[in-house]
Amino acid sequence: MSERESWHKEIDLFFVAMGYFTRIPMPKWVEVDADKLNKASRYFGLVGLLVGLLSAIIFWLTQNWLPAGVSVLLSMLTGILLTGGFHEDGLADTFDGFGGGWTAEDKLRIMKDSRLGSYGALALIMVLLLKWQLLVELALYDPVVAGSAMIVAHTVSRVVAASLIFTETYVRDDETSKSKPLAQHQGINDLFILIASGVLVLLVLKGIAALSLLLVMIGLRRLIVVIFRRQIGGYTGDTLGAAQQICEIVCYFVLLVVGGIL
């Protein structure tokens, strides 16, 4: 494979990842298949970077004319519209399953139900409110920091969530599952590119903030793994969405605390 063909392949994989995780239309020349979707996991962090950047731009464009709370709300709405609420849906399904089921089989069955239950609704409301409040506090502290936090959090949270694919067991055996292709064997190159995107985006932060966030994310990932293994024995597409949302919230919390210290 020539260097040009290799670059074209990587661009294809990025667009496949973008098409899977967002509502942004892929170029018509991009062909999607299970193998490409499997390899596209390496670019999930960059998709988060794109979503975070667009959300931050909306915030920065409006924060001089609108109250901080409204600008933050518009940035959150931008992220939700870009992804179609993909991760929020996974969060709600995960909490419905974990909260309403006794056995792993019960939990997986409930998570597959498209109806929203009380556990999922409460989790969704609390996460959105907490995200809004944390971002408003960051915006009042420094609008530049708030926008940068959006970019970092959207990227890093997706890197952590996607990294579960490489180490954990996919526990849903439904062949119609949209996440099934992602559950196939992942190569070390895929993991390296994924992690690199998360590490590189940390460069926009100050040293202590970047180090603090990195250490917290490592610890949080371990905690998420323990919980998922105890609850259902591994992961599903829904739990990856839940992991992303939880990690995003924690990113904002860490940056707010560290920002207050600095």
From Swiss-Prot:
<dbReference type="Pfam" id="PF02654">
    <property type="entry name" value="CobS"/>
</dbReference>
<dbReference type="GO" id="GO:0008818">
    <property type="term" value="F:cobalamin 5'-phosphate synthase activity"/>
</dbReference>
<feature type="transmembrane region" description="Helical">
    <location>
        <begin position="43"/>
        <end position="63"/>
    </location>
</feature>
<keyword id="KW-0169">Cobalamin biosynthesis</keyword>
<comment type="function">
    <text>Joins adenosylcobinamide-GDP and alpha-ribazole to generate adenosylcobalamin (Ado-cobalamin). Also synthesizes adenosylcobalamin 5'-phosphate from adenosylcobinamide-GDP and alpha-ribazole 5'-phosphate.</text>
</comment>
<dbReference type="GO" id="GO:0005886">
    <property type="term" value="C:plasma membrane"/>
</dbReference>
<keyword id="KW-0460">Magnesium</keyword>
<keyword id="KW-1133">Transmembrane helix</keyword>
<keyword id="KW-0997">Cell inner membrane</keyword>
<feature type="transmembrane region" description="Helical">
    <location>
        <begin position="191"/>
        <end position="211"/>
    </location>
</feature>
<dbReference type="GO" id="GO:0051073">
    <property type="term" value="F:adenosylcobinamide-GDP ribazoletransferase activity"/>
</dbReference>
<feature type="transmembrane region" description="Helical">
    <location>
        <begin position="66"/>
        <end position="86"/>
    </location>
</feature>
<comment type="pathway">
    <text>Cofactor biosynthesis; adenosylcobalamin biosynthesis; adenosylcobalamin from cob(II)yrinate a,c-diamide: step 7/7.</text>
</comment>
<feature type="transmembrane region" description="Helical">
    <location>
        <begin position="146"/>
        <end position="166"/>
    </location>
</feature>
<dbReference type="InterPro" id="IPR003805">
    <property type="entry name" value="CobS"/>
</dbReference>
<comment type="similarity">
    <text>Belongs to the CobS family.</text>
</comment>
<keyword id="KW-0812">Transmembrane</keyword>
<protein>
    <recommendedName>
        <fullName>Adenosylcobinamide-GDP ribazoletransferase</fullName>
        <ecNumber>2.7.8.26</ecNumber>
    </recommendedName>
</protein>
<keyword id="KW-0808">Transferase</keyword>
<keyword id="KW-0472">Membrane</keyword>
<keyword id="KW-1003">Cell membrane</keyword>
<feature type="transmembrane region" description="Helical">
    <location>
        <begin position="242"/>
        <end position="262"/>
    </location>
</feature>
<feature type="transmembrane region" description="Helical">
    <location>
        <begin position="120"/>
        <end position="140"/>
    </location>
</feature>
<dbReference type="GO" id="GO:0009236">
    <property type="term" value="P:cobalamin biosynthetic process"/>
</dbReference>
